Curated annotation (Swiss-Prot):
Name of this chain's protein: UDP-N-acetylglucosamine--N-acetylmuramyl-(pentapeptide) pyrophosphoryl-undecaprenol N-acetylglucosamine transferase
Gene: murG
Binding of UDP-N-acetyl-alpha-D-glucosamine, residues: T13, G14, G15, N125, R167, S196, I251, A270, L271, T272, V273, T274, E275, Q296
Family from the record: Belongs to the glycosyltransferase 28 family. MurG subfamily.
Organism: Psychrobacter cryohalolentis (strain ATCC BAA-1226 / DSM 17306 / VKM B-2378 / K5)
EC class: transferase
Membrane disposition: Peripheral membrane protein
This enzyme's EC code(s): 2.4.1.227
Organism placement in taxonomy: Bacteria, Pseudomonadati, Pseudomonadota, Gammaproteobacteria, Moraxellales
Length: 361
C-alpha cells in the first residue's frame, strides 16, 4: 500500500482542532501523510505547527451573525476557497478528505465532491453545525460524537456514532475510584475553567460564591489570557481566609489538572464535556448562552440526563446558587457523579475514527 495522503480540515476552536490532532497522530503511526487545511490567522496555526504536518491556509470566514456585508460576499469567497482546495487536493495527491469542523470545512467538502475524493466528516457537538449539516448530504461517511445529533433517517446508511477523539494524556488519567478517597476529609479541590479565553461570568461569580461557603475549598482557577489581574482582584476582595486559591491565565497540562480536581466548574464545549466523561470528574456546567443553536446546553445534557453532572444555566448563575451547589457536594457524592460520567465515555473513539478513515482509503 502506498503512503496515503489525508487532508484534515479543522479550524477556529480547540473543540475542532484537538480531536483532529488526536486522530492525525493515530493515522501517522499507521504510516499516513497528514496535510492540514486551516485559515491564515486561526488558532490551528500554533497547534499544528509542532507536528510538522504541511499546513495549507485558505481565506474563509464564518457567516452566521456577521451581517449582510459578509453574506453578500460569501458566494465569491466560497468559490475562491473551493478552487484553492481543489488545487491542494490535486497538487498533493490527496486520497481522502476528513472534516472536523470550522469555516474551512465547507469549501473543503465541496472540493472533495468536485474532485471525487472520499469525504468523511465528524461532528463533535450534540447539535450539528451548519457546515456539517450541509456536507452530510455529500459525505462518504458521517460520524457523530453523540446519538441523534443529525436526526436524519436519510443518513442512516452512512451515519455512525463514534464519540469524540481525545488525546492520550486524557485517556491515561486514573479512573475515579482510584482518585477519589471517600474517607479523605480535607478541602475539596475545585477546578474552574472558562476555556482558553476564560469566562468573565465565572471569574466574577466564583470568588463571591466561595465567600458564602462554610467548608474549605482548594481552588485552581483558569481565568483566560489578559484576565489574571482582574480575577485575582475579585478573589482578594472577598474574605476567603479558609480557602486556598490559585489564579492563572491558562492551564497547559489539563490531564494533570483533571487528575488533581474533585469538582470542575466550566463551560460545556464538546471537547470539555468529552474529556470530563473520559476522566470521570464531578462537574457543574455553565453553558455559553451565545453558542450557536445553544449547542453547549445540548452537550451538557448528555451527562446531566444521567445525573453525571449538574447543569447551571448562566441566567441562573448567582453567587448564592453556585455556593449552594458546591456546598451540597462531598467526596462520596463527587465519586458517584464521576463514575456515572466515566461509564458513558467512549475511550476508543480515536482508534475507532482512525479505523473508519483507514478502511475508506
Amino acid at each position: 500500500m502506498k503512503t496515503p495522503h489525508i487532508l484534515m480540515m479543522a479550524a477556529g476552536t480547540g473543540g475542532h482542532v484537538f480531536p483532529a490532532l488526536a486522530v492525525s497522530e493515530e493515522l501517522t503511526k499507521r504510516g499516513a501523510m497528514i496535510h492540514w487545511l486551516g485559515t491564515p490567522n486561526g488558532m490551528e496555526n500554533g497547534l499544528v505547527a509542532p507536528t510538522g504536518y504541511p499546513f495549507h491556509a485558505i481565506e474563509m470566514q464564518g457567516l452566521r451573525g456577521k451581517g449582510i456585508g459578509r453574506l453578500l460576499k460569501m458566494p465569491v469567497t466560497l468559490l475562491s476557497a473551493t478552487m484553492a482546495v481543489i488545487k491542494i487536493i490535486r497538487g498533493n495527491n490527496i486520497d481522502i478528505v476528513v472534516g472536523f469542523g470550522g469555516y474551512v470545512s465547507a469549501p473543503g467538502g465541496i472540493a472533495a465532491r468536485l474532485t471525487k475524493t472520499p469525504l468523511i466528516i465528524h461532528e463533535q457537538n450534540a447539535i450539528a453545525g451548519m457546515s456539517n449539516r450541509y456536507l452530510a448530504k455529500m459525505a462518504t461517511k458521517v460520524l457523530q460524537a453523540f446519538e441523534n445529533t443529525f436526526g436524519n433517517s436519510q443518513l442512516d446508511a452512512k451515519l455512525e456514532t463514534v464519540g469524540n477523539p481525545v488525546r492520550n494524556a486524557i485517556t491515561g488519567v486514573a479512573e475515579p475510584i482510584a482518585r477519589y478517597d471517600i474517607n479523605d476529609c480535607s478541602a475539596l479541590k475545585l477546578l474552574v475553567v472558562g476555556g482558553s479565553l476564560g469566562a468573565q461570568v465565572l471569574n466574577e461569580t466564583v470568588p463571591k460564591a466561595l465567600a458564602l461557603i462554610e467548608s474549605p475549598f482548594e481552588v485552581r482557577h483558569q481565568c483566560g489570557r489578559n484576565n489574571e489581574a482582574a480575577t485575582q482582584a475579585a478573589y482578594d476582595e472577598q474574605d476567603l481566609s479558609m480557602h486556598k486559591f490559585t489564579v492563572q491565565p491558562f492551564i497547559d497540562d489539563m490531564a494533570a489538572a483533571y487528575n488533581w480536581a474533585d469538582i470542575i466548574v466550566c463551560r460545556a464545549g464538546a471537547l470539555t464535556v468529552t474529556e470530563i466523561q473520559n476522566v470521570g470528574i464531578a462537574a457543574i456546567f455553565v453553558p455559553l448562552p451565545s453558542a450557536v443553536d445553544d449547542h453547549q446546553t445540548a452537550n451538557a445534557r448528555t451527562l446531566t440526563l444521567h445525573k453525571a453532572a449538574i447543569l447551571l444555566p448562566q441566567n441562573e448563575l448567582t453567587p448564592k446558587r453556585l455556593s449552594e451547589e458546591l456546598a451540597a457536594l462531598d467526596r462520596p457524592a463527587c465519586l458517584e457523579m464521576a463514575k456515572k460520567g466515566h461509564a458513558l465515555a467512549n475511550r476508543q473513539a480515536c482508534q475507532h475514527v482512525a479505523n473508519i478513515i483507514w478502511q475508506a482509503l
